[in-house]
């Protein structure tokens, strides 16, 4: 998600910090990962959000609780891409699992029995959530309204539990 360097990145839901990685010398660059309970997201499983290419190490620690919309890092361009040059951007990923357990070996976090989730599925109000099933939906069912915070911190719609990682006007 392209954004100017230093743009604050927001937690997409209430959660807990489970990983902060410098990732010196790899493609992801500076990274933070959060775990979200089913109660925090309103989804029927545990979700894990991953944010990479941050411009600096986050001012958070593993185990910190974060609120939806809290700043968790700043947009940057950290990470190695060989000879390719890219602009400042957030690489944003969501994983999910029926299990609450995960591991962190100091280089990567891994949800137990976890799977990558199409971010579109994360913002759906009901299933399907599995990417292959989502792909089978007719085009008319693939458009998903995404909740967000206004620049003043007001969630749209009110009561949203999952938001876009950047505020909107």
Stretches with model-predicted labels:
Residues 37-40, 48-52, 62-73, 88, ...:
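Glycine- and acidic-residue-rich phosphate-binding/metal-coordinating active-site segment common to enzymes
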Residues 1, 15, 69, 92, ...:
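Terminal peptide-recognition signature
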Residues 11-56, 85-91:
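Zn2+-dependent peptidoglycan hydrolase active-site motif and core
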Residues 2-4, 51, 56-60:
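Short alpha-helix capping/helix-loop boundary micro-motifs
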Residues 75-89:
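Active-site loop architecture of trypsin-fold serine endopeptidases
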Residues 20-21, 54, 75-78, 97:
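Residue-level recognition of beta-strand microenvironments
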Residues 64, 85-169:
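Acidic, glycine-rich catalytic/binding loops that coordinate metals and/or anionic ligands
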Residues 8-19, 59-75:
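Short, well-structured beta-strand-loop connectors
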């Amino acid at each position: 998600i392209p954004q100017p360097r230093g743009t604050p990145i927001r937690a997409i839901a209430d959660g807990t910090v489970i990983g902060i990685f410098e990732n010196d010398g790899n493609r992801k660059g500076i990274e933070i990962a959060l775990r979200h309970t089913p109660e925090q997201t309103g989804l029927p499983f545990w979700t894990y959000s991953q944010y990479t290419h941050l411009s600096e190490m986050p001012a958070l620690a593993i185990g910190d609780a974060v609120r939806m919309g809290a700043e968790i890092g700043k947009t940057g361009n950290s990470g190695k891409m060989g000879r390719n040059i890219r602009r400042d951007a957030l690489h944003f990923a969501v994983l999910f699992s029926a299990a609450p357990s995960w591991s962190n070996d100091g280089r990567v976090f891994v949800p137990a029995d976890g799977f990558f989730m199409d971010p579109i599925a994360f913002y759906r109000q009901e299933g399907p959530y599995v990417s292959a099933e989502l792909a089978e939906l007719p085009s008319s069912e693939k458009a998903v309204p995404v909740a967000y915070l206004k620049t003043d911190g007001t969630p749209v719609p009110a009561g949203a539990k999952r938001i876009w990682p950047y505020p909107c006007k």
